[in-house]
């Protein structure tokens, strides 16, 4: 474990019982020697302490911690995805989180240190606008593929304190967004190659979720960079009828996943009595 980190979760991947290998669940087997491979998730002690302190200040108590892409995966994945093998790519504000499932087992997790906030800052510095303007342009006019942006379309940005208005090319905006999103997807490809899983192994492809996944043409860029099928993951797999439509947006995947985690833990505890 890295210095300054602590274990958040220990997830079993597979078991061995004597000469029997790759056993997902050892219950029912008999033998002399039992072994296992585990996926250990760690986190920075200071960050964990700050999270606990923030929760306690709100009058609540932290029961458990869960890695963001695992929470999102719980909200957007179904049993078929788990069986087929998928990569969950959760594009948040500060980071992009990756969780890879193969043969029903969590095989890999990673945190890529770039997210939607980096794109906003790139637009701010590249086009010389305010951060609020950069965020608004990204949401309203942004595209992850510059080839899909209209060459002769411009956005008018009001001038500051009497200065003349500024004309921003939609094409230039898309070029900036594509550069950063391509970098993020290159990291995703790198991690998948490192663990030996690609489009031939992950038949379910890539599931994009999180607030950053709402960028136009992101699916096409992801498929181009990674060579894998991609789709947007909506957190509606486990929502009951009559739910608020707002909750089905990808930006709420982590929140829905955490609620599911809490509910499932309560149900297990309740049924044990």
Locate each region found by the language model.
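Residue-level detector of high-confidence beta-strand sites
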Residues: 109-111
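Conserved phosphate-binding/catalytic loops in two-lobed NTP-binding clefts
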Residues: 225-255
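Phosphate/pyrophosphate-binding loops at sites that engage ATP/ADP/AMP, CoA/4′-phosphopantetheine
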Residues: 185, 189-205
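Feature representing long, continuous alpha-helical segments
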Residues: 121, 175, 179-186, 190, ...
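Glycine-rich phosphate-binding loops at beta-strand->alpha-helix junctions
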Residues: 43, 143-145, 200-225
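Nucleotide/phosphate-binding catalytic cleft detector across ATP-hydrolyzing
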Residues: 1-88, 105-106, 116, 129-176, ...
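Residue-level signature of catalytic and energy-coupling elements of molecular machines
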Residues: 55, 90, 123, 188, ...
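A short acidic Gly-Thr/Ser loop motif
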Residues: 88-95, 101-104, 113-117, 210-213
């Amino acid at each position: 474990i890295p210095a300054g980190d602590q274990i958040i979760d220990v997830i079993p991947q597979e078991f061995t019982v004597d000469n029997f290998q790759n056993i997902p669940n050892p219950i029912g087997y008999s033998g002399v020697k039992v072994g296992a491979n585990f996926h250990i998730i760690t986190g920075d002690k200071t960050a964990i302490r700050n999270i606990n302190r923030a929760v306690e200040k709100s009058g609540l108590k932290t029961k458990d911690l869960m890695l963001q892409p695992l929470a999102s995966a719980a909200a957007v994945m179904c049993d078929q995805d788990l069986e087929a093998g998928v990569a969950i790519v959760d594009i948040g504000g500060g980071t992009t989180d990756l969780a890879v499932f193969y043969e029903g087992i969590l095989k890999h997790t990673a945190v890529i240190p770039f997210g939607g906030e980096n794109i906003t800052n790139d637009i701010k510095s590249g086009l010389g606008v305010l951060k609020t303007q950069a965020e608004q342009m990204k949401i309203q006019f942004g595209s992850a593929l510059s080839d899909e942006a209209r060459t002769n379309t411009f956005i008018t940005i009001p001038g500051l304190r009497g200065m003349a208005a500024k004309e921003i090319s939609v094409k230039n905006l898309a070029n900036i967004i594509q550069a950063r999103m391509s970098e993020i997807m290159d990291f995703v490809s790198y991690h998948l190659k490192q663990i030996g899983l690609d489009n031939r192994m992950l038949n379910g492809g890539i599931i994009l979720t999180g607030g950053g996944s709402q960028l136009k043409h992101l699916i096409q860029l992801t498929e181009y960079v990674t060579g894998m099928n991609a789709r947007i993951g909506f957190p509606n797999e486990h929502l009951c009828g009559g739910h608020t439509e707002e909750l089905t947006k990808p930006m709420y995947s982590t929140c829905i996943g955490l609620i599911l985690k809490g509910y499932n833990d309560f149900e297990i505890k309740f049924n044990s009595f």
